[in-house]
Amino acid sequence: VYDQVYPIIIMKKPAKSTARKKFERPVLFFSQMWYNAGSYFSGKDIFILKAIGRVISSAILLVLTGLMVAFAKAAPNVVFSFYPALSKSILSAIASVSSLVPIALWEVLTVLLALWFFYTLIRVFTGRRSLLRWLSGVLLGLSAGVFLFVAIWGLGHFGPSVDKSLGLDVREYSKQELIAATAYYAAQANEYAEKVERNVENLTVYPAFSTLSKQAPDGYTALARQYDQFTDGLGPVKPLASWRLFSQTGTTGIFICFTAEACVNPDTYTAWIPFTMCHELAHRQAVTAEDDANFCAYLA
């Protein structure tokens, strides 16, 4: 009897590369750490840890916001040598998306956010959601909103006024100069009053809101050829769908930096609408101060 020797083939796994091992080690470490945390802490404790994490994240965002403001105040020449251009670039990128819809996108997002707010609040009162977790989520959302507001647009409040960016000579004017300026603008108003279209009752006939909203950016297109402060290619101004609410507070327009939308209340004096459109478009040009936006609207 001859013993038959059967070869045994042992399949070995190919050796892992050093780079792959280095990648997998931290992944396995954090996975194991999370598993161990789940073993040591109950579900309630996990929610508490998440709430603490949100509070810490909120604190970090608020500290970063404070640092941005402090640095802008301490070194305005450095910050505002690049921030206005950066702000306009970010707003242009956002506007390239929000301009795809004819309505004010921020109003839709506000309604959805309000619905989500009350939905989660109801879950708190019904015991399906922890109050601490809900409050930490609200805090994180508000902190993120403040951080983004300052980073995208709001930091301009601490920058130089528009007269400096345009290189204008600002000085105290005499009484005679003010009288001369008043007479000049009165003559200009009378001259153009004869050129505007009027109806049978001799009242001015204004173009439709949609027509004015498309014409308003043209003023800044002309200014962009003369001043670096301004850019062309601005989208049309949008009407406010919730104009009744804004009419209650006397608000004629609003600019939302999160969606880069310049919006105007159509329920206002018709003669004010063109100026208000140019005012809100000035905010779209990273002009934050209200007086500066008024002056830019006058130029446009």
Segments the model singles out, each with a brief description of its role:
Residues 62-123:
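Membrane-embedded alpha-helical segments of integral membrane proteins
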Residues 102, 275-287, 294, 298:
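Active-site recognition of the HExxH zinc-binding catalytic motif
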Residues 4, 13-32:
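Positively charged N-terminal leader segments that act as targeting/secretion signals
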Residues 50-55, 128-139:
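Membrane-interfacial entry segments at the cytosolic side of transmembrane helices
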Residues 200-266, 270:
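Auxiliary, metal-adjacent structural segments of Zn-dependent hydrolase domains
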Residues 118-119, 132-163:
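Transmembrane alpha-helices and immediately adjacent membrane-cytoplasm interface residues
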Residues 2-10, 32-36, 40, 44-46:
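Short, positively charged and aromatic/hydrophobic N-terminal segments
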Residues 156-223:
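Membrane-interface segments at or immediately adjacent to transmembrane helices
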